[in-house]
Each structure stands twice: as C-alpha cells, then as structure tokens.
Amino acid sequence: MSFICPQCVGERYLRYQVQVAAEPENACEYCDRGESAADLWMVATRCEDVLDTFFELSSNTMAVIHFGRTPAGHDLHTTISNLTGMPQEAVEVVVEHLNSLWYDEASGESLYGDDDPWFVLKSSIAEPLGYAWREMEESLRADVRYFNPKAAELLELVFGELINDLDKDGQSIIIEAGPDTSLTTLYRGRVFQTEDALASALQWPERLLGSPVAGIGAAGRMNGQGQPAFYGATAPEICIAEVRPPVGSWIALAAFEVIRPLRLLDLRRLATVVLPSEASLFNPATRPAVERRDFLRELGNRLSAPVMPELQDRDYLVTQVVADYLAAHCRLNIDGIIYPSAQSTHPDEPPAGSNVVLFRKASEVADAEERGGETAEIALWEFEEDGPQKWFHPAILFKDRDEHWYGCRLFHPALSLRRDSIVIHEISAVRYESKSYKVECVFSFNDRC
C-alpha cells in the first residue's frame, strides 16, 4: 500500500477526495508535512473512472499498428500525471494499480493490451442525450405533443442553464438586440405572385410586410399554424433566398428597426459552449455537464438543418416545441432565436448573415394595429404624359395617422418599419448550386470503382 496526502495532489477536486479519504494513521510517502494520507488505490479507481468516461484508446488504430504513426494524445503515465498533478513516483504507483485493475486473470489479457496504452479525450460523449432526444422526437410525433412530460423534462435539462452558458470567448450565448447594441435592424421579405397583391400589401406595409396576425400565418420552423412570429434576417440577401420565390414573382423587402431591448438565443454559439474553468473531470457533476456541452454542439445544426417541403409537418414539430418552450420559459426570458440560413449557405464563402425569428411577444410592429386601416398610398407604374408608354417606378405616400384613435393599441411593439427601406425585387431567374453524381452501370455491385 502507498499513501499520499492532499497537499501532494495538484488537481483541486481530486485533492478534496483525498482529503475526505485520508486517515491520521496513514503517513504520506511523498512529503514530510505529516498530514493525514489516503491510499493511492483510491486515486487509481478515480482515474479509472475518468479514463473510462472521458478518454478513448488511441494506440490501437490502423495508422499506429500498421504504419507506425505516433498515437494521438499521451501515454498512460503522462495522462495520469496531467490529470492528477501528483509527484512522478506517485503516478508510477497509480499506473501499476491501473494495470492491475485492467488485467483479467481468466483470459490472461489486459483491457488495453500488453503494450503501453495511449489515451486521447473523446471527441464527444453526447450519445446518451442524443438517444434521449431521438426518443423525445418519436414521443412528440406518435404520443403526446402538448403537455408531454418526457419532452418537458429533457428540454429543461438541455436548455434550462442557457442563461449561465458562455462561449469560448467568455460571451453569453444569449445576445442583446435593440438600441445601443450591434443588432439594431432586421430585414424581412414577402413574396407576391401578382401586382395587385403586391400593391395591396404596400398600402399597409407595417401590417402586411411584418408578422402575420394571429390565426392567419402558416406554420414555420419555429411556429405553429396561426401562431404569430416574425421571420427576418440580419442581411437583406438572405431574405430573398429564404422565401424561395418562383420566377416571375415579386419580393417586397423592408428593414425593421428593433426599438426595444430583446434577448435572442444564438444557435450559432451553441457549438462553442465551454465548461466553467473550475470544472473537474473527477467531479461526478462534470459528466452530465460535458454530455450536455457536447450535445449542444450538435443541436444547433439539428435545429437549423434544411427540411424538405414534404417533410415539414413532421420535422418542424420538434423545432416548434423547442421554440414554444423557450418562449414561455420565465427565467430565460428569450424573445427569439438567431440561426444559420439553410438556403443561402455557400461552401467556400463566409455566411452573409443569419436568420432571426422573434416569438409572438416580440413580433409586433408599430402602426400595425387597427387604426383607420391603410397607412399609405402606392403607385407601382409611372406613365408617359402624352403617350402609351409606362415603366415600373414604385412610389409610396405615407398618410398621417389618427392620433386621437382610441381603439386597441399595441402596448409594447418591438419593431418599427423603416419607411425609406422598402425595395421591390422582380425575380427573373433562380440559380441553384448542386453536386452531381454519375450513375455507373455495373454487372455486380462488387464491381463499383
């Protein structure tokens, strides 16, 4: 038996575990402080748990065995030394204990082979949460959508601590939008297939270019049928791609100022969430935290992945439930979500911007309420004075509103139409980017090149 005192252990939480297990009659073999000490066998069992949970063997890969490459990570001795911060003599004892723990007398073999094993941190331990998420998806689709206890429990586990999460730069993944922030303007486009529909919408752009009123709008990625939501983007060109206009249609594109502070969950930052600096791999609470962190890194892509039109009802169900949960969570107090555009991504180019969806509580536009109806007069064409010629030259004349109107007003509109920002795009062609695959004719599938 070999004993070590807490002061000879560099890792903070492991030092605490040694302190709890230390006995006065045990003398530390690595210093002369005379403090109570614990058996290094206990340290070895803790190290075994950490290696099994967070590390994987890297010295048994094809590149190492057949091509003599140096394994990724570190050998066992260095790994234990880095984990524990103990004197090298104590590390050697722990390595001996681990080899003893891993040896199977029945087979005469060690768990990690006879050679010196090398270990590297696992790229992800998110599978338990990933499995639970897939079960939740099936439960929502096949069992209960509303008041689903399985979904509520998992969503709280995944999202409940978002308010405390930080990215690799120490920034919150919930960002501020609105006055005096870096995000003050959102762009929104709407597609029209006739001039009459376009002209009608421009007569009340605050209402008809903004979010649909309750009970009218179609279901979307983050909202159910008839549930108001403002879908916009941080750059105008993204709006055109997102509405997927047919050739010959028109798009009315407008900028909306964010006029009050909003809190937006940035899905792009989920992939960069880090653990607190004081997190210890020896602390049992760290494993679920790492599982959650690794799952969050995948979740942003899941929630913003492209969805085929014929699968929208099925695949949007989960993202709609997530949005409902976030919108109603009192402690998080989230007004919307920022997520990557699935329609305007170019492999070799940085993204031009991102999509933004504002939940109902933050989707209202100033002057969109019923107050005398239309707010503007519109003329799409300019005509030659003395001839038959005409050309497309849209112009809008905003009318004065009735300031003494006593109807139902919006108490806290979050957006205001920038009146001079409206642009009409006539869609004359659509360009697609694709990757082609030649279908090879074969006599047997084993003959494929």
Which residues does each predicted region cover?
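Short active-site loop/helix that positions an aromatic residue
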Residues: P236-V247
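Active-site and NAD+-binding cores of ADP-ribose-processing enzymes
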Residues: M1-N223, P246-C449
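Short, well-ordered beta-strand elements within core beta-sheets of diverse protein domains
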Residues: Q227-A233
